[in-house]
Amino acid sequence: MSLSTLKRDHIKKNLRDTEYDVVIVGGGITGAGIALDASNRGMKVALVEMQDFAQGTSSRSTKLVHGGLRYLKQLQVGVVAETGKERAIVYENGPHVTTPEWMLLPMHKGGTFGKFSTSIGLAMYDRLAGVKKSERKKMLSKQETLNKEPLVKRDGLKGGGYYVEYRTDDARLTIEVMKKAAENGAEILNYTKSEHFTYDSNKKVNGIEVLDMIDGETYAIKAKKVINASGPWVDEVRSGDYARNNKQLRLTKGVHVVIDQSKFPLGQAVYFDTEKDGRMIFAIPREGKAYVGTTDTFYDNEKATPLTTQEDRDYLINAINYMFPTVNVKDEDIESTWAGIRPLILEKGKDPSEISRKDEVWEGESGLLTIAGGKLTGYRHMALEIVDLLAKRLKQEYGLKFESCATKNLKISGGDVGGSKNFEHFVEQKVDAAKGFGIDEDVARRLASKYGSNVDQLFNIAQTAPYHDSKLPLEIYVELVYSIQQEMVYKPTDFLVRRSGKLYFNIQDVLDYKNAVIDVMADMLNYSETQKEAYTEEVEVAIDEARTGNDQPATKA
């Protein structure tokens, strides 16, 4: 199956008429990883997501697939070792969505990291995380540190560490994993909310009843097993089951701000400690912008729409001006923001940054499997753990046998580029090929870098589609049409926020082209006038929330 919005009705019919080995509730990176692993082993898989894919936590991270240097500080050695190895796998299987990025770690007198401890720590990190030779840490003098990033605070500067992180587009990583699962036969649908579990005569879960969030229809999906992978909604989903354990989530909120490089001319990614509380945060250049985050505060409010408060903005502005004192960033320099929720497992008495990011699998008497906690980087290994258990139960209860996990070397959608070492060459080949389609070289390079081995489909759209009638630039038009045909974009915000990332990193494009995008989608997807008005309002709300945030309390009134 493809993830085509134009096939929604067909997918829905299949979901109604088929009994699956497993139905997964949740369409973030965790659910996507499980769908890929299970379908790759030959299981019959369904997945539903009540919003858009990655709309919860998986589009709101720091957008790093990282080895977890901060966990070394907390002596979580096992976490560093596992995430480091997983990071390399994620990169190799999808170099079009993950890119190595050298990170500068400035060391100041009285700061979190001293020269000796940093050198030892980074050496341990390299060893534990299995870092390749070309990417192993370097220790820098004060002058070398300033050469890397002249904006860094000079007062008390002793030197710096230099090590590699991996930058990603979290929402695109999620959709590429999801597309590969669909390619393997998984039946996947967004805007489909799990409302209730269904049970057999032995009180074992045997499916879910769902609500189509677009047309209001309800129907049942039958499955031998159900996996709850709903991130921040894990507790709500399993509250409908009679057999839940006493574990629960503790949500924390993380906020990022985006500033144009004309206001904050950051040339080098920097990982630094704040003056206020010593928390480590990132400042990362991307596409002519610099984004900075994250905060870490307890959160008990609306899960679907966590917002950036003035307190969050002030915290990050103060952090920027402390570490980069000559830039003098002001609140009005912030172009866009995003806020995300971390679904952590409750550990009483701990501060937000102290709570472990580990994942756990919970199995209820009803047979419901729930996966909680975890991180973006570990999605593949998390899937391996729960699908191993799923396979074991399907064998015990139904006599079904499936292959072992084989995702370690499985390319995600768009990842067939000849390996990470060949990726730059692959992109240049595609740039040459694009000349035959009359596509500008810079546009072709951006598309090939972003879509990997799927880029030929976008080139074909460029050749055949009537984009001149759309009032859209060719690049935006082909991405939009492709996202409808292959990435299950149904609402304008799906495209403007998650598939393209424009709301965060090019909000001017959203302001300039939002109406043209809505017109193309209304035409392709036959929106009613009511839908068009509602979705237009959603775009306006998203713009407002990204630009100004809100005075949203951490706890519901």
UniProtKB/Swiss-Prot annotation:
This enzyme's EC code(s): 1.1.5.3
Keywords assigned by UniProt, alphabetized: Cytoplasm, FAD, Flavoprotein, Glycerol metabolism, Oxidoreductase
GO terms assigned for molecular function: glycerol-3-phosphate dehydrogenase (quinone) activity
Protein name: Aerobic glycerol-3-phosphate dehydrogenase
Gene Ontology terms describing biological process: glycerol catabolic process; glycerol-3-phosphate catabolic process
Cysteine pairings via disulfide bonds: none
Catalytic activity of the protein: a quinone + sn-glycerol 3-phosphate = dihydroxyacetone phosphate + a quinol
Cofactor: FAD
Matches recorded under SUPFAM superfamilies: FAD-linked reductases, C-terminal domain, FAD/NAD(P)-binding domain
Positions of FAD binding: 21-49
Any one of the GO CC terms: cytoplasm
Organism listed in the record: Staphylococcus epidermidis (strain ATCC 35984 / DSM 28319 / BCRC 17069 / CCUG 31568 / BM 3577 / RP62A)
Biological or metabolic pathway of the protein: Polyol metabolism; glycerol degradation via glycerol kinase pathway; glycerone phosphate from sn-glycerol 3-phosphate (aerobic route): step 1/1
Enzyme class: oxidoreductase
Subcellular localization: Cytoplasm
InterPro entries in the record: DAO_C (IPR031656), DAO_C_sf (IPR038299), FAD-dep_OxRdtase (IPR006076), FAD/NAD-bd_sf (IPR036188), G3P_DH_FAD-dep (IPR000447)
Gene, per the UniProt record: glpD
Family under the similarity heading: Belongs to the FAD-dependent glycerol-3-phosphate dehydrogenase family.
UniProt keyword annotation of Oxidoreductase present: yes
Record carries keyword Membrane: no
Highest taxon, organism lineage: Bacteria
